[in-house]
């Protein structure tokens, strides 16, 4: 029904954010709403999906079309509902999920809340070969950039100044870690030295 909303983020809460569009506040459930902290009171475009249930109409918001497409694909898997799909997207990128599905990595999928071996197998069975992945080198760079950006936001939340963060950002870009935690640990060591 709604493809996207373009407006100002007014409120960020643990499960959702409120985006004001033409004087109306839309409550949008999003994966990890706190990643929008740096955009509070700023104009953004939020790609949306309306889910109508018997007892509620819920609006889900995503940073891009790729994330929205992954949400919709996961939501169609037997045993996965919108809540589980959001939980998966809150801690992983669509590219990482596709890579796990294509490599049949059940161990990667069962780390998400509410996903057991049976559901992980169902995700692989339903989605393998049906999702597209970008070029490997592009994928790796994109994943690294996402992880690094989340680490930089963590430094901001820890109270480091923009100037301090900019100093270590160039060095961190040279690293190729696979998790945000690794970037944060390395960055904290750089701040100390």
UniProtKB/Swiss-Prot annotation:
Its main location: cytoplasm. The keyword Repeat does not apply. GO terms for biological process: DNA recombination; DNA repair. It is found in: Cytoplasm. Residues 64-141 are annotated as: Domain II. GO terms for molecular function: ATP binding; four-way junction DNA binding; four-way junction helicase activity. Residues 141-142 are annotated as: Flexible linker. SMART domains: HhH1. Pfam families: HHH_5 (PF14520), RuvA_C (PF07499), RuvA_N (PF01330). Keywords: Cytoplasm, DNA damage, DNA recombination, DNA repair, DNA-binding. The RuvA-RuvB-RuvC complex processes Holliday junction (HJ) DNA during genetic recombination and DNA repair, while the RuvA-RuvB complex plays an important role in the rescue of blocked DNA replication forks via replication fork reversal (RFR). RuvA specifically binds to HJ cruciform DNA, conferring on it an open structure. The RuvB hexamer acts as an ATP-dependent pump, pulling dsDNA into and through the RuvAB complex. HJ branch migration allows RuvC to scan DNA until it finds its consensus sequence, where it cleaves and resolves the cruciform DNA. Has three domains with a flexible linker between the domains II and III and assumes an 'L' shape. Domain III is highly mobile and contacts RuvB. Belongs to the RuvA family. This is Holliday junction branch migration complex subunit RuvA. It comes from Macrococcus caseolyticus (strain JCSC5402) (Macrococcoides caseolyticum).
